[in-house]
Amino acid sequence: MQRPKVDDDLTLATDFGKTEAFVVEVLDNPATEEGVLLKVMTRGPFEQGQQVWIVDRDGSKVGANVENVSEQTIDNEVTLSTVLPA
């Protein structure tokens, strides 16, 4: 999986099914050497600490942790932390 860019579409697999998201910000995660923080806009009942999967176009999955959820009208701004494979 390549490092996402702003405005990329992502598919997230969660406890409540699959949902679409789009990337609004990509940052290096200072807590982990190769970690990435992704701020995405998406819909669904996300909670801090929740585990989700980012599903790549080829069907491969990368685990991510919900770091923060900020409700914005219908959509939520969700911050995900992950380590992308090289």
Where are these regions (language model features)?
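Beta-strand/loop-dominated core regions that host nucleotide or nucleotide-derived cofactor-binding catalytic loops
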Residues: M1-A86
